[in-house]
C-alpha cells in the first residue's frame, strides 16, 4: 500500500477515524457519517463461505524443476525439457476441521498443487496419503457428514464415524494409515504428498499411460504421537502454518522429490486389481516409481485471505498431455471442486491473481458476472464470428477411454484381487511392533467411545479380516478400555 493519508474506499481523505459523527455532544449518531456506515457494512461482509472440506489451510509459492526427460510418456509442455522450471502454488490443509480448528490433529492433510504452465494452469489436488476412504464420489457427502458435527449434538460423534467406516469396508486401508504413525504429521514440511488418483498421460504419438504421483519430502518424515498432538493443539493451534511460514522466512526452503508410477494403458484391463480404485496403491515391484523432478517452496503469500483463502483448485484443470482416468471418485471431483469454488468465491474466481494463469493468458468468450474485471474489453463474446479472436485447436488434451456395455448404475469392473482388506493387512504387517502398538492404542481409544456394541464389533471385524492378529489385539484393547 502506498503512503499517504487514510481514505475511504472511494479514495476521499478521512478527517477523523476515531469518533463517529453525532448530533451535538453526546447526541445520536448521524446517518450522514458515511465512513462509519462504510466500515460497518464492509466488516459485515468480510467473510466468505469456508470450504466445506479442507477449510483449515496454509500455502506457499514455489518452483517445480524437471530433472528427467518424460516426453516418451507425456506431451505436456512443462514436462518437456530437463531443467525446465515452472512456478507453483501449494495449499496444505486438514480435511474435517473448520477454519478455526487446530493444525495438529489426526486427519488427512490436503495437498493441492497448482502448476502455472505455458499451456494453462494444471491443478493436482491430492492428499498426504496415497489412498482414500471411499472409491465412488456418490458416497462422499455421506462420508463427510460423519466427519463433521452431528446435527443434533453439534459435536463429532464416534458412533457416526465408526458406523460409516464399519459399513464401508473399503475404508479399512485408509483408516489403518490414518491411525498409524503418519496420521498426525509434525508439520507440513515433514510429510509426503500424493496425487492419490490415477491420471492419464498421453504422448505426441497418442499413446496412453496411467500414472500416479508421489512427492517425497526431503526433510524426512516426522510425526506426532497422540499425546504430543493433544498438547500442541492446545498450546499452538497454528503450529503447522507457523512452521511453514517461518521456515520460508529464514530461507530454509522445503523441498520434495517428485516421482511417478507409470502403467502402460494395455496393462489396466488385466491387472490383478482395479488400477483406478482410490482405496488401493500400486505395488512398487509392479510399477517402480520414476524420479522426474523436484518441488521447492520459497515464497510466502503476502495476504492470507487473498492468496490462500481465495485460492481455488480443481482436478478438472488439465493441460495438453494430461487427463482423467475412469476413477469414479476422481470423476465426481471433476465437477464438485469447480462448483464449490463458484459458490464460495464467485464465478470470476479464476480472475484473481493467485488463480489466473501466470505463464499464458486465459482467452474465453465468457463474460460478466460478479467482480468481472473487464479483461476482454470490447472483443466479441461469441464464437464462431467474423471478427477474429480465440478459436478451438481441434486437438483434445487427453485421449479417449474405450468403454463397453450400456449405461446404468454399475460397480467398477471386477478384477481378481479387488478385495477391501488385503492392502490394509499388508500395511499392518509392514509395521514394527512399536508401530503396531501405537496403531492399536490410537484405534482402540476412539472405538471405545462408540456407544453401540454392534457398531464397534463391525469396525473391529473389518480389521480382523485384514489381519487376524490386528483384529484380536484391537478387540482386546477396546474391551480393556470399556471394562
Curated annotation (Swiss-Prot):
Residue numbers annotated as active site: 54, 127
Region called Disordered, residue ranges: 1-24
Keyword field: Heme, Hydrogen peroxide, Iron, Metal-binding, Oxidoreductase, Peroxidase
Q: Name one GO molecular function term.
A: catalase activity
Please tell me whether the keyword Metal-binding is annotated for this protein: yes
What domain of life is recorded for the organism? Bacteria
Gene Ontology cellular component annotations, sorted alphabetically: cytoplasm
Record flagged with keyword Isomerase: no
Gene Ontology biological-process entries: hydrogen peroxide catabolic process; response to hydrogen peroxide
Q: Where does heme bind?
A: 337
Write out the catalysed reaction.
Answer: 2 H2O2 = O2 + 2 H2O
Q: What top-level class of enzyme does the UniProt entry assign? A: oxidoreductase
What's its EC?
A: 1.11.1.-
UniProt lists the family membership as follows: Belongs to the catalase family.
This protein is called Bromoperoxidase-catalase
Q: What is the source species?
A: Streptomyces venezuelae (strain ATCC 10712 / CBS 650.69 / DSM 40230 / JCM 4526 / NBRC 13096 / PD 04745)
Taxonomy of origin reads: Bacteria, Bacillati, Actinomycetota, Actinomycetes, Kitasatosporales
Amino acid at each position: 500500500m502506498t503512503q499517504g493519508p487514510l481514505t475511504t474506499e472511494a479514495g476521499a481523505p478521512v478527517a477523523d477515524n476515531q469518533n463517529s459523527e453525532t448530533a451535538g455532544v453526546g447526541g445520536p449518531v448521524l446517518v450522514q457519517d458515511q465512513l462509519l456506515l462504510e466500515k460497518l457494512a464492509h466488516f459485515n461482509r468480510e467473510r466468505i463461505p469456508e470450504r466445506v472440506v479442507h477449510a483449515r489451510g496454509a500455502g506457499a509459492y514455489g518452483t517445480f524443476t524437471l530433472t528427467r526427460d518424460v516426453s516418451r510418456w507425456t506431451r505436456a509442455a512443462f514436462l518437456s525439457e530437463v531443467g525446465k522450471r515452472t512456478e507453483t502454488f501449494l495449499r496444505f490443509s486438514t480435511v474435517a476441521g473448520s477454519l478455526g480448528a487446530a493444525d495438529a490433529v489426526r486427519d488427512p492433510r490436503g495437498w493441492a498443487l497448482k502448476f502455472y504452465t505455458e499451456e494453462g494452469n494444471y491443478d493436482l489436488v491430492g492428499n498426504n496419503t496415497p489412498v482414500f476412504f471411499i472409491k465412488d464420489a456418490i458416497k462422499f457427502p455421506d462420508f463427510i457428514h460423519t466427519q463433521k458435527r452431528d446435527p443434533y449434538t453439534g459435536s463429532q460423534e464416534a458412533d457416526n464415524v465408526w458406523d460409516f467406516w464399519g459399513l464401508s469396508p473399503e475404508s479399512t486401508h485408509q483408516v489403518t494409515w490414518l491411525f498409524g504413525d503418519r496420521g498426525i504429521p509434525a508439520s507440513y514440511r515433514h510429510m509426503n504428498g500424493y496425487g492419490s488418483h490415477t491420471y492419464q498421460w498421453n504422448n505426441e504419438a497418442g499413446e496412453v499411460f496411467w500414472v500416479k504421483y508421489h512427492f517425497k519430502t526431503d526433510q524426512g518424515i516426522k510425526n506426532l504421537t497422540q499425546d504430543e498432538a493433544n498438547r500442541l493443539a492446545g498450546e499452538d493451534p497454528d503450529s503447522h502454518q507457523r512452521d511453514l511460514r517461518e521456515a520460508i522466512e529464514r530461507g530454509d526452503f522445503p523441498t520434495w522429490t517428485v516421482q511417478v508410477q507409470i502403467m502402460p494403458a494395455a496393462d489396466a484391463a488385466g491387472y490383478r486389481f482395479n488400477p483406478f480404485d482410490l482405496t488401493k496403491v500400486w505395488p512398487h515391484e509392479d510399477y517402480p516409481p520414476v524420479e522426474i523432478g523436484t518441488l521447492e517452496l520459497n515464497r510466502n503469500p503476502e495476504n492470507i485471505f487473498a492468496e490462500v483463502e481465495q485460492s481455488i483448485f480443481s482436478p478438472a484443470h488439465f493441460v495438453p498431455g494430461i487427463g482423467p482416468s475412469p476413477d469414479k471418485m476422481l470423476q465426481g471431483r471433476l465437477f464438485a471442486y469447480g462448483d464449490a469454488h463458484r459458490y464460495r468465491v464467485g464465478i470470476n474466481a479464476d480472475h484473481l491473481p493467485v488463480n489466473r494463469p501466470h505463464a499464458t493468458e486465459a482467452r474465453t468468450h465468457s463474460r460478466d458476472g460478479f467482480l468481472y474485471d473487464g479483461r476482454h474489453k470490447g472483443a466479441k463474446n461469441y464464437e464462431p464470428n467474423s471478427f477474429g479472436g480465440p478459436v478451438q485447436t481441434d486437438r483434445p488434451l487427453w485421449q479417449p477411454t474405450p468403454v463397453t456395455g450400456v449405461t446404468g448404475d454399475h460397480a467398477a469392473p471386477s478384477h481378481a484381487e479387488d478385495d477391501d482388506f488385503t492392502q490394509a493387512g499388508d500395511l499392518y504387517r509392514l509395521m514394527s511392533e512399536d508401530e503396531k502398538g501405537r496403531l492399536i492404542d490410537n484405534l482402540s481409544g476412539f472405538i471405545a467411545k462408540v456407544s453401540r456394541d454392534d457398531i464397534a464389533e463391525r469396525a473391529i471385524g473389518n480389521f480382523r479380516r485384514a489381519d487376524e492378529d490386528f483384529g484380536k489385539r484391537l478387540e482386546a484393547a477396546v474391551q480393556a478400555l470399556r471394562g
